[in-house]
């Protein structure tokens, strides 16, 4: 038997004269484009790829690159092996389904965020709860307390009768600066913000475009063109994204600049009848926080513990005399320990999110579960906050009679 060898050779294209011969159908790359790239000095496959956009469409060259390499090799009078290939990218290289689906591996791949007082709270045997990615102290059980209600009731009673401290670092914090910040805030909040005095804080209600409550929180005017906004923990990211959208897309002509500083500041609520006395022990003497100098809803820059810069806000979500003090995060753990030591004579206690919720509800504030994306300002008893003297996001749809119905 005689074996006749086949004379097979690659045929990469038919000379077409002036007609176009397509190589990459997705990016409209032709044989002429590849030859032109070679003529202009692009000999490497990677260079030709970027010069012509060959293989840079959704298939990443899966349907065109072999043909293109053959055309290049033929044009330069060399083999395909000498010409080389581009770097393989998905979906050219098979990917295991497990890489997409994955599997639970405990907490290995779960992102976590810890408050500055986390180590101290752990030392106090705090019970933690996941709030978004944060771990927050839920309550602080003492020896002999066998039920969480015992701990929470004690924390509430002690805070109301003397003083308690709660880590509220997880609240969103946004620094906003610019000549038009007042006008900007007046457009995003349902209540008036155009004339907030310097050194004052105002509670604000923010609505979505459909009139449903998005978030609530306080915003302090630190100077003429500098405001500090706080948001709820759960909505810190969504509110910041909302503000960016409002500025960039709705009112780009306003002079407004903002940045999230949630992780840059540790913040503690100091609440109770003795809260001012406790703070006076750590606030530097030149900073007057008396009732006359620092009244309700005041805000200002202070120094503590011999010159450490801090921010102080006289706001209360507990129904008692209360303050919130913010300090650079690196001092957060130390400040918690200093506050607890300074408050020993007042029998200061730490309180967690459960006691915070109890006191917030008893005062009549909206609690976290009520801001669930389904409630209106009227559902929360805040219909009176909606200004009728200005336009703002959610104004028109927020006044629908259906949202004001008492039996919703």
Regions found by a protein language model. Name each.
Residues 20-24, 38, 57-62, 103-111, ...:
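Hydrophobic alpha-helical scaffolding
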Residues 51, 67, 71-207, 212:
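Acidic, proline/glycine-enriched N-terminal capping motif
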Residues 9-29, 35, 57, 134-136, ...:
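Cofactor-binding beta-sheet edge motifs in enzyme active sites
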Residues 5-9, 154-161, 206-216, 252-254, ...:
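Short amphipathic beta-strand starts and helix->beta connectors
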Residues 192-246:
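Well-ordered mid-protein domain cores that form the structural environment of catalytic cofactors
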Residues 114-123, 136, 223-408:
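Conserved, structured C-terminal
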Residues 2-88:
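C-terminal catalytic lobe of FAD-dependent flavoproteins
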């Amino acid at each position: 038997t005689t074996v006749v060898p086949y004379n097979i050779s690659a045929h990469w294209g038919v000379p077409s004269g002036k007609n176009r011969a397509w190589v990459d159908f997705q990016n409209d790359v032709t044989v002429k484009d590849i030859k032109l790239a070679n003529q202009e000095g692009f000999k490497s496959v990677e260079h030709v790829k970027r010069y012509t956009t060959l293989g840079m469409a959704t298939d990443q060259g899966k349907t065109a690159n072999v043909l293109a390499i053959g055309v290049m090799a033929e044009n330069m009078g060399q083999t395909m092996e000498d010409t080389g290939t581009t770097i393989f990218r998905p979906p050219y290289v098979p990917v295991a389904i497990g890489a997409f689906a994955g599997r639970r591996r405990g907490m290995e791949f779960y992102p976590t965020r810890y408050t500055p007082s986390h180590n101290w709270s752990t030392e106090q045997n705090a019970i933690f709860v996941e709030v978004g990615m944060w771990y927050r102290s839920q309550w602080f059980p003492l020896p002999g307390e066998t039920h969480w209600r015992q701990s929470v009731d004690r924390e509430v009673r002690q805070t109301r009768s003397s003083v308690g401290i709660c880590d509220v670092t997880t609240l969103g914090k946004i620094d906003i600066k610019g000549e038009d910040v007042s006008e900007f805030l007046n457009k995003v909040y349902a209540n008036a913000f155009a004339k907030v005095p310097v050194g004052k804080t105002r509670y604000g209600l923010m609505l979505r475009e459909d009139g449903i409550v998005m978030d609530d929180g306080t915003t302090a005017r630190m100077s003429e063109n500098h405001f500090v906004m706080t948001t709820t923990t759960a909505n810190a990211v969504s509110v910041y994204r909302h503000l960016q959208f409002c500025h960039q897309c709705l009112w780009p002509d306003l002079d407004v600049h903002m940045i999230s500083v949630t992780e840059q500041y540790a913040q503690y609520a100091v609440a109770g009848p003795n809260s001012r006395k406790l703070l006076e022990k750590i606030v530097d003497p030149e900073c007057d926080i008396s009732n006359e100098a620092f009244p309700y809803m005041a805000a200002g820059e202070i120094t503590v513990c011999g010159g450490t810069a801090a921010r102080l806000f006289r706001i209360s979500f507990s129904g008692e005399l209360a303050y919130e003090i913010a300090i650079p995060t690196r001092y957060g753990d130390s400040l918690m320990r200093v506050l607890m030591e300074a408050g020993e004579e007042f029998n200061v206690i730490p309180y967690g999110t459960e006691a915070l919720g109890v006191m917030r509800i008893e005062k009549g504030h909206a609690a976290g579960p009520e801001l669930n994306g389904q409630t209106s300002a009227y559902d929360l008893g805040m219909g009176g906050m909606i200004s009728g003297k200005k336009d703002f996001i959610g104004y028109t749809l927020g006044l629908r009679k259906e949202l004001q119905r008492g039996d919703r």
